[in-house]
């Protein structure tokens, strides 16, 4: 049977999961400035196509065929940029554009709660945020990269101004089902990075991260501390090298979603939609 590799074309990064569990991540910021322009920039497309070529070569070296899925940035892009990107990417590997609900479903499968109807999942990416449990799946076009663009354009840089700008932008984008769920899994780089930072880690430790409970109060405190530290300090932190400018905006989106859904705490998980899609292609392709 042909080995397979899954590739996630995200709004902040492009990731791959290989046949032996190997993971790669390349930050490309595909959704950069999409809030103001409505399209994928030429530079972002170029970075992302280069990343796909690199990951395709890696899969080939492992004897695997790569299958990619695209999320919010590609899903929402206009003015021909979506078609241009998909044409270029399709020459490298098959690409499926997921709906927000499909994205949430694969995340739930990947996180291992597909058979846990009483659990909820929040998936915060670069361009969108999904809330999902048994009976509902909600996707809002707001993630850490889009939130950064909003903060750059609509705030004065202070924490309160950034919070106000992000919360204002989130209003009307999120739909919160009237349902009470006690246990929540949190996936996506913003959430797992916050969990690592809450533990004082300077090197990512998957076991430690997935063993912690990330409360809303702790997230709020971290958000303020990260803002107070300044971008220069954040950029020198080993866990924030490529996330230093989106971690605070992304955390504000997370706080808005948790507040709206009444989520008091999250169980962070590294396994997410990429893992779910890998399971899918292994069973169906």
Question: Could you say what each language-model-derived stretch is?
Answer:
Residues 8-11, 249:
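A short catalytic or substrate-binding loop motif that flags glycine-/basic-rich loops and adjacent residues
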Residues 4, 18, 22-24, 33-57, ...:
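Helical "lid/coupling" subdomains associated with nucleotide-phosphate turnover
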Residues 27-29:
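Short, glycine-rich, amphipathic interfacial segments at transmembrane boundaries or analogous
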Residues 3-9, 119-122:
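Two-metal-ion RNase H-like nuclease active-site motif
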Residues 12-14, 127:
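Conserved Rossmann-like nucleotide-cofactor binding loop
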